[in-house]
Amino acid sequence: MLSCHELVLDSAANRVTARGQPINLRGVEYRLLEFFMSHSGRTFNRHQLLDHVWGDDSEVDERTVDVNVQRLRRILAESGHQEYIQTVRGYGYRFSAPNVARAE
């Protein structure tokens, strides 16, 4: 389980909640959020995100990362957490949330 403030990702249940309310994510959005939360504060370029989230052998282009990050931002904005995913101009993206906690 990963949490920051009131955003909780429960990997055992494949569920994300914000302020106790469920957030509906598609598979890739869930994996992207899980990866970002697991590596909070680190910056990743599109190619790295493709490798880690979609897999080394995926045949999607880097624009797919942008589309899915925007979609995830929009979903998180509905619960007041859009500021966590930051664009690092000329490089990629970073999940920047204070105190991401990991619990079993």
Label each region the model flagged:
Residues 13-15, 20-68, 74-83, 89:
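Positively charged, aromatic-enriched patches within helix-turn-helix-type DNA-binding elements
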Residues 81-104:
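A short linear beta-strand->loop->alpha-helix hinge motif most characteristic
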Residues 1-3, 103-104:
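Basic, amphipathic DNA-recognition helix from helix-turn-helix-like DNA-binding domains
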Residues 2, 8, 78-80:
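Generic detector of short alpha-helix boundary/capping microenvironments
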Residues 4, 9-11, 95-97:
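Conserved catalytic Walker-motif region of ABC-type ATPase nucleotide-binding domains
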Residues 8, 22, 99-101:
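Residues that cap or initiate secondary-structure elements
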